[in-house]
Amino acid sequence: MAHRQLYSYALQPSYAAAASTVSPAPPPPQQPLPPKTGLSSLYGSSADHYFPDTTYRFLARDGSEALSNYSGTLASSSSMYHHLPNTTASHLAYPQLLQHQEVAWPPGVEVPGAASAVEPLPPGVKRTSEALYYPTLLGAHNTIGQTEAWYTTDYFTKRPKLESTSHLPIYPQRAGEKDCTHYMQTRTCKFGESCRFDHPIWVPEGGIPDWKEAPVVPNEEYPERPGEPDCPYYIKTQRCKYGSKCKFNHPREEAAVSVETQDSLPERPSEPMCTFYMKTGKCKFGLSCKFHHPKDIQLPSSSQDIGSSVGLTSEPDATNNPHVTFTPALYHNSKGLPVRSGEVDCPFYLKTGSCKYGATCRYNHPERTAFIPQAAGVNYSLVSSNTANLNLGLVTPATSFYQTLTQPTLGVISATYPQRPGQSECDYYMKTGECKFGERCKFHHPADRLSAMTKQAPQQPNVKLSLAGYPRREGALNCPYYMKTGTCKYGATCKFDHPPPGEVMAKTTSEADAAGATNTDTTQ
C-alpha cells in the first residue's frame, strides 16, 4: 500500500496552491450544455491531439466541460487499461473526477490539497512505465511549467513525453551522464536497461542522424597517483586518452622523452633485425620496438679509400653523418642490387623483392643466379672502383659494349629456401626459382631444381646482357613488365627482349616518322 502511495499524485510545494485552484469542484447537477461552447468548440473535439490534455485542463473556460469530455475519450483510447473493466479504466484514466471520494492515507502523512483527489490503485494493479513519463496519467508528476521546457534553449532541460512519442520504447534516464550516441542518432539502444548513458525522451523517432557529442576541451594535466603503477601509454607517448579518469600514475618528472641508449634497446633474437637500428645505431621507438637490436653491431666510423672512389653512404642523411661509409659491392644481382656475402640480408628486399636504396644499400641482396665478373671471364681491370656509382649493370658506365656471357660461366649462388619433403612444391619457386616468403614458406623447395637448371644451361644459346643485366633477345617480343617498370623479376632467365630506353625511344620515333610519311603519300 505504501509503495502505491509513493507514486501517487505528489506536487511540489511551490505549485501546491496553483494545483489546488486547478482541481475542479464536485460536478454540479447534470445540465444540458449549450452546443459548441468552451475551448473544445474553438479547437475541435476534446480528442484533438494538436493540444495535449494539459491545455484542456488549465486553459478551459469551464473545467468540468474539459474533464467530462476528455475523460471518456482517454479511457476508451488508452491502451494501458484495456485489460481492466470500463469503470476501473475510466477511474484510472482521470483520477481528478473522483475528487469527491474519500481516500485513505497512512496516519502521520500530510495530504496535499490536490493529492486527496487521487484514488488508490485497485489491488493487483501496478503502475506501468508509461505512467511515469506521461504528464496526464495517474498524476505521476505535476505538469505546471512543462510547456516552457519544450521551448527552452537549455540543452540539458528534460522535455516531457507527449502523445506523438507514446509508441516509442523508453530507455533509462540518467541525469548527469553522457548521452548515448547510438540512441541519439537512431532512437534505439541495444543495451536497454543496462546502458549506463542517458537517453533523453525528447529525441524524435528515427533519432538525429547528424548528432555529434560536444567536443571536450582536452586537459593536458594528467592525474598523479603516487603508489599506483605508472601508465605505460603515458610513459611512452606522453599522452593518455583516458585523461583524468585514468587510474594509473602519470609522473611529471618523466614527461621529457629520454634518449634511448644502445644498452636500453630490447634484444629479440627471434624477431627480424631493426632496419633503422642496423643503419644508424639508434631507434626512435625505444623499448616499444618489436624488432631485434643486437649489442655487438659495428658501424663504420671512418671513410675508406677505395681507389679513386669517394665513399657513398647508405642513408639519405649522409651529409649529417659523413663518417658512415660502406664498401662498394663487387657485383650485383639481375636487378642491379648489390650482393654482399657475409652481410645481413636486406629485410625490405626479402619482403618486397626491391630496395629503395638501390646500389648504395650496404646489405646483402641474394639471388639464385648472381653474375660474378671473374667467373664470366670479363677482364677485371675494366671494373674500377666506380662500380659503386652504378645503379644498374655489372660494369662502369664507360663500357658501352654488352658483355657476352655464356650460361656455363655464370656463377650460381643458392638461396636458402626450405626443403619440406612431403609437402606440395612451391609453384612460384618452380617457375621462377625465387620465393618471396623465403624461409617462412610452408611449401617444398627441391634442391634438384638447381641441378636441372645447370644441366639445361649448356644447351641454351649465348645470352647478350644489357648494362642493367637483362637479356637481349633480338627478334623476340619486348618484355611487357620491363617496358612498364624498367625492371624484370625473371632477370637473365626471361625469354623476352629487354632493349635499353634509348633504343626504345629511337625505335618509337622512327615508327612515328614512317607512319607520318605513309599518311602523306596516301593523301597525295
UniProtKB/Swiss-Prot annotation:
Region named Disordered: 19-39, 300-319, 505-524
SMART domains: ZnF_C3H1
GO MF terms held by the record: DNA binding; mRNA binding; RNA binding; zinc ion binding
Biased composition (Low complexity): 512-524
Organism the protein comes from: Arabidopsis thaliana (Mouse-ear cress)
ZnF (C3H1-type) residues: 174-202, 225-253, 268-296, 340-368, 420-448, 473-501
Domain of life: Eukaryota
Biased segments, Pro residues type: 24-35
Keyword set, alphabetical order: Developmental protein, Differentiation, DNA-binding, Flowering, Metal-binding, mRNA processing, Nucleus, Repeat, RNA-binding, Zinc, Zinc-finger
Organs and tissues of expression: Highly expressed in inflorescences, at intermediate levels in leaves and stems and at lower levels in roots.
Pfam families tied to this protein: zf-CCCH (PF00642)
PROSITE patterns (alphabetical): ZF_C3H1 (PS50103)
UniProt subunit comment: Interacts with HEN4. Interacts with FLK and PEP.
Subcellular location: Nucleus speckle
Protein name: Zinc finger CCCH domain-containing protein 37
GO biological process: cell fate determination; flower development; mRNA processing
Gene: HUA1
Function per UniProt: Involved in flower development. Functions in floral reproductive organ identity by binding AGAMOUS (AG) pre-mRNA and promoting its processing. Functions in association with HUA2 and HEN4.
Main location group: nucleus
GO cellular component: nuclear speck; nucleus
